[in-house]
């Protein structure tokens, strides 16, 4: 298609050729004929290349995100890309029912509860500017025919560092796309708040975090046992948590027994590092004062083993998008309203999303009986979700506030938060303090992400 680079097209074709040999194995991905749509009618990531009928969703722009005038080249301060745009639509308490078909169940729940209090969506023009490196596209094309789920969906075989399932055939494949999404190494200082039922903002955490992504270093080797991310969080507030450290190694392809997540904690009271298997699933997350679970972070993370996953289909939905101004430029304290984030700081766009519904497996335990996810077709990130309690009531809902790291190699970064409709509280996590976000690991080596070095840091 026009605009897709010749290099990219050639690398996709070569990958499809390799993939067609792999595809002869019994459980492989889609047929080479289907996969040939990548880079043609579908983007290299499997999204629909074209816009929608009424033009409210444009065609994908392979040129990538624009560089705004005020951006300093090489800086990690990714200011808003569309500073002169105004909302083209405001969906509020008086008109939301007209737009019901394009709202998530959670957003409808917010209007029902807070529409009269000023909850609204400020909708801006849609910009589909998400791009990835050419090697990532080539690996994605290879994966389309060669990657396959085994071990009851707990493991991917035959995948290279790219999107594992650009043309998903199941809910499990779609959620794996979200779980091992493309990311760049970063380090940041951030504050996490929750707002209690009286409308008071409470600091849950101040911390420094470093995330690196080993899986995307060796671009021409299968993922295998490689780690998707190593994350280390050093806490400095509140006082009772100052000095605590959390370390997580998250797999790139394998959650089978003995594999999967490895987590360690350094607790100042114990003055030692210990394995922390409870840093997973529905354990309340102290990073947000227990207001959501560990597996709520980034809307969903971790092993998919406790749920049945269903791919419901695709829909046009209003979700947060291109929120650089909020994520990188806005002071969080200024955005915290008594019942919800200030609607003036959040940018919404109409997007095509994959809807994935998950229900708790028989015999499994979890606080949530059901969860629904809305996965953006361009980024393959769950931008919104809903969590239901054991009685089937809508309990919590979440949004990711995505931002684009533009420039040399486009990256995806996000903050995220949840609303609790039963307890009337909400939280916001992972938003950098303005000016305190940096690309790269901040000069630390991979040893920094080991229990040994963590123990030394803790003792200091």
Q: How would you label these PLM feature ranges?
A:
Residues 177, 183, 190-239, 297-373, ...:
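Extended beta-strand-rich segments in extracellular/periplasmic secretory proteins, especially
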Residues 1-7:
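Short, Lys/Arg-enriched N-terminal segments with co-localized hydrophobic residues
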Residues 1, 70-71, 291, 408:
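Short alpha-helix boundary/capping motifs
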Residues 29-30, 34-63, 104, 232-304, ...:
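Gly/Pro-enriched, hydrophobic low-complexity segments
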Residues 436-460:
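Long, C-terminal catalytic modules of enzymes
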Residues 23-25:
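N-terminal signal peptide c-region/cleavage motif recognized by signal peptidases
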Residues 9-18:
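Sec-dependent signal peptide recognition
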Residues 32-260, 267:
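Solvent-exposed N-terminal domain segments of exported/luminal and surface proteins
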């Amino acid at each position: 298609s026009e605009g897709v680079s010749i290099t990219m097209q050639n690398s996709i074709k070569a990958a499809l050729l390799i993939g067609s040999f792999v595809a002869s194995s019994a459980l492989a991905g889609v047929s080479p004929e289907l996969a040939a749509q990548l880079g043609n009618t579908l983007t290299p990531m499997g999204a629909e290349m074209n816009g929608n009928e009424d033009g409210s969703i444009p065609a994908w722009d392979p040129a990538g995100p624009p560089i705004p005038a005020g951006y300093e080249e090489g800086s990690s301060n990714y200011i808003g890309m569309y500073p002169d745009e105004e909302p083209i639509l405001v969906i509020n308490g008086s008109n939301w029912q007209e737009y019901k078909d394009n709202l998530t169940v959670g957003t409808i729940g917010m209007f029902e509860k807070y529409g009269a209090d000023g909850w609204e969506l400020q909708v801006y023009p849609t910009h589909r500017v998400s791009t990835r490196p050419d090697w990532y596209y080539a690996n994605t094309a290879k994966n389309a025919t060669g990657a396959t789920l085994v071990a009851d969906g707990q493991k991917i075989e035959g995948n290279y560092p790219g999107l594992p399932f650009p043309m998903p055939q199941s809910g499990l494949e779609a959620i794996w796309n979200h779980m091992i999404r493309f990311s760049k190494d970063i380090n940041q200082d951030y504050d996490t708040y929750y707002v209690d039922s009286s409308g008071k903002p409470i600091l849950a955490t101040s911390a420094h975090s470093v995330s690196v992504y080993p899986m995307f270093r060796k671009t021409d080797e299968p993922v295998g046992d490689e780690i998707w991310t190593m994350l280390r969080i050093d806490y400095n507030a509140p006082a009772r948590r100052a000095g605590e450290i959390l370390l997580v190694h998250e797999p790139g392809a394998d959650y089978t027994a003995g594999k999967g997540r490895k987590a360690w904690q350094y607790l100042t009271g114990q003055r030692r590092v210990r394995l922390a298997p409870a840093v997973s699933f529905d354990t309340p997350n102290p990073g947000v004062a227990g207001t959501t679970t560990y597996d709520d972070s980034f809307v969903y993370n971790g092993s998919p083993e406790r749920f049945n996953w269903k791919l419901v289909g695709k829909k046009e939905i209003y979700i947060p998008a291109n929120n650089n101004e909020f994520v990188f430029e806005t002071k969080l304290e200024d955005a915290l309203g008594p019942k919800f984030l200030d609607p003036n700081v959040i940018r919404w766009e109409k997007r095509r999303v994959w809807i994935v519904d998950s229900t708790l497996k028989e015999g499994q335990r979890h606080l949530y009986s059901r969860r629904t996810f809305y996965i953006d077709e361009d980024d393959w990130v769950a931008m919104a979700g809903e969590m239901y309690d054991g009685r089937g009531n809508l309990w919590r809902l979440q949004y990711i506030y995505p931002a684009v790291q533009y420039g040399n190699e486009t990256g995806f970064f996000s903050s995220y938060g949840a609303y609790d409709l039963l307890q009337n509280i909400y939280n916001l996590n992972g938003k950098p303090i303005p000016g305190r976000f940096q690309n790269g690991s901040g000069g630390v080596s991979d040893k920094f992400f080991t229990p040994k070095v963590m123990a030394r840091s803790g003792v200091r």
